[in-house]
Curated annotation (Swiss-Prot):
Residues that bear Phosphoserine: 230
Induction and repression of expression: Down-regulated in HL-60 leukemia cells by RA, PMA and dimethyl sulfoxide.
RPEL repeat boundaries on the chain: 93-118, 401-426, 439-464, 477-502
Superkingdom in the source lineage: Eukaryota
SMART domains cross-referenced by the UniProt entry: RPEL
Protein name: Phosphatase and actin regulator 3
Amino acid sequence: MAASEDGSGCLVSRGRSQSDPSVLTDSSATSSADAGENPDEMDQTPPARPEYLVSGIRTPPVRRNSKLATLGRIFKPWKWRKKKNEKLKQTTSALEKKMAGRQGREELIKKGLLEMMEQDAESKTCNPDGGPRSVQSEPPTPKSETLTSEDAQPGSPLATGTDQVSLDKPLSSAAHLDDAAKMPSASSGEEADAGSLLPTTNELSQALAGADSLDSPPRPLERSVGQLPSPPLLPTPPPKASSKTTKNVTGQATLFQASSMKSADPSLRGQLSTPTGSPHLTTVHRPLPPSRVIEELHRALATKHRQDSFQGRESKGSPKKRLDVRLSRTSSVERGKEREEAWSFDGALENKRTAAKESEENKENLIINSELKDDLLLYQDEEALNDSIISGTLPRKCKKELLAVKLRNRPSKQELEDRNIFPRRTDEERQEIRQQIEMKLSKRLSQRPAVEELERRNILKQRNDQTEQEERREIKQRLTRKLNQRPTVDELRDRKILIRFSDYVEVAKAQDYDRRADKPWTRLSAADKAAIRKELNEYKSNEMEVHASSKHLTRFHRP
């Protein structure tokens, strides 16, 4: 009895037979789990079934793999997941390292970096001229050159010390630079003289080399601070080079400078290198990508070709200016280089001056109005200004002002004649042209046919008012005669011509009802439908008997 009670109380478990295919799959699954495979691969294996089934339940059928299961074997997406996880881990670890090595705001302020950047931003916004002021390096006097050469001798301890100095020391010199900028500036005459002097080809090449590499020993801080002048208010016009070689070298150097100034973000400025080649590291310098350099070269070439083609056209048009055009052709490359230098110094006023020199004939496109300065601060780059004019993104005030300036600067008739746009003619030439036109017109008019000829051809008909009135009277008489001859209705009935529809069709009297709308009294109720169905069934019962094979198709079956 105890055994029976135990048996009734708990479910008896029985083992599966060895012939059951699901046992094989279960054993393989357990073996793979014991082998210690990756968790990613374990996701793909089917879930292990229980080894013992409850008694009284049928064994489930063999599970069939779907067609999509074979795709998992071929493509193995869990391996892709594994690779993705590894990549994510690498990136996260790299980011954590960077964040750990990142300097705080307080440290940057201590070093003097952050304060300087804020002051730069303030100077940009507060500049009254429009463009951001460019810090120009003044070529030092011969005395300072000798001093620097003595200091930078390889044997001296100062030079060795500066060689070993890391990047942190030049970064800390930014604070000294700010102090130097706050110092009282020199007189306006001295500033103009200092600004007008520009570094020669050797100095420019040295400046490029100094900006690219930090190998050259930096100067002592006291001297660099002393030699940095206060920035001049206006950018200075670049002087023309003397020989072809100097032209080429300066052109290349300024091209690279311009491209770097354009490509660099406003927050990141490049190194300012003095003529001796020692870089004063103001902020971090981002290296220029080669694609940008190529773009700048292409742009410079395009401007050169445009100038050449324009001046070639001018020389064809006006024979008086051929000698001037030849000279301008030779100096076209020089002009291109000057323009690039102007971009590198970010001088808005200088751009306007050079544009006025180069495009005297293109007066309409010049912006001379001083009221436009405030609105066009954002559009100091010519290309950006042109794009904004074409796309219509300029503010409305700017558009109006530009239109007014263009209309004001429209060239006169004499100027157009001088430039061979409007043909130059004397009074005699004009008279001859008029006579030729008159001759052509008179010849055409003489070829027109006369009135008699048109009447003869029956094209033109001469009419009087009397004849027209007579024609109208005749038409009225004809119409009234026809109307009088019409028979009356009675005559037509007598002749049985006009017969009514009701004469030969039986017409039953019926109530008139509104056929237009779907009204509730027009709709059939349930009782109406039942009556119709009953009537139909009665009609069907009186008709011919339905065949036995098609009785299921009919609604009515005779009892």
